[in-house]
Design a protein with these regions (language model features):
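Conserved SGNH/GDSL esterase-like catalytic core that processes O-acyl groups on lipids
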Residues: 2, 7-9, 15-109, 197
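Active-site phosphate/pyrophosphate- and oxyanion-stabilizing loops and adjacent acidic/basic residues
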Residues: 30, 116, 158-161
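Solvent-exposed polar/charged
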Residues: 34, 120, 162-165
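A short helix->loop->beta-strand "cap" motif at the edges of active sites that frequently abuts
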Residues: 38, 119-127
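Generic structural signal for well-ordered alpha-helices
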Residues: 70, 111-115, 157
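Catalytic His-Asp segment of secreted/periplasmic serine-dependent ester chemistry enzymes
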Residues: 132-198
Length: 198
């Protein structure tokens, strides 16, 4: 796909909306727009948001999960990039579920709902999935503050990879290729001082 002059939708969380960037112009969406001469980078990032549905939905913007926001994005865009999963691990209430799930109430189900919805809405257009980056507490099955044990971050990454493979969607596996590892002191100091946001 020729990126120059194209419109790309970016659906994501705090990293997409620019937390950790020193200015709006330094958000990865804006950097990509300049580097590839996009006509427009539509930023649909909401800090703290999750792919899967919360059990109790509040009026807080971050409780508007990716599945809820699917139909709010510019349908005329030439491509879509989805970057998420870290908040599902960190503080999401949804259980993991099983591969057969198709409801946003589980992480598996939400991944299916989102990816199939994107394929239906953006027929013939590229939809790219980005896996979560490593984070400081990625091995804690309680995430940031869950009162119950669910799974480490690598399990959420694995589900994203599995469901994307099922739908034939390309994946940029940032967990495996970003070079960011907050458990390494030098990497954390240079690339993500808070252990989460680059």
């Amino acid at each position: 796909m020729e990126l120059k002059g194209s419109v790309v939708n970016f659906l994501g969380d705090s990293i997409t909306c620019g937390v950790g960037a020193s200015s709006e112009e330094k958000r990865f969406t804006d950097v990509l727009a300049r580097e590839f001469q996009l006509q427009k980078a539509n930023n649909y990032g909401i800090s703290g948001s999750r792919i899967a549905r919360q059990q109790i939905i509040t009026a807080e913007e971050y409780d508007r999960d990716y599945c809820m926001r699917l139909d709010e994005m510019d349908q005329s865009a030439d491509a879509v990039v989805v970057f998420g999963g870290t908040n599902d691990f960190g503080h999401g209430e949804a259980p993991l579920g099983v591969f057969a799930d198709r409801d946003p109430a589980t992480f598996y189900g939400a991944c299916h709902f989102l990816m199939s919805g994107l394929l239906n809405r953006y027929v013939g257009k590229p939809v790219v999935i980005l896996t979560p980056l490593h984070r400081w507490n990625e091995d804690d099955p309680h995430g940031d503050r869950k009162p119950w044990s669910v799974a480490p971050l690598k399990v959420y990454r694995g589900i994203l990879l599995e469901v994307a493979l099922y739908y034939g969607l390309p994946v940029l596996d940032l967990y495996a290729t970003s070079g960011i590892q907050p458990s390494n002191e030098v990497s954390r100091a240079r690339l993500c001082p808070d252990g989460l946001h680059p």
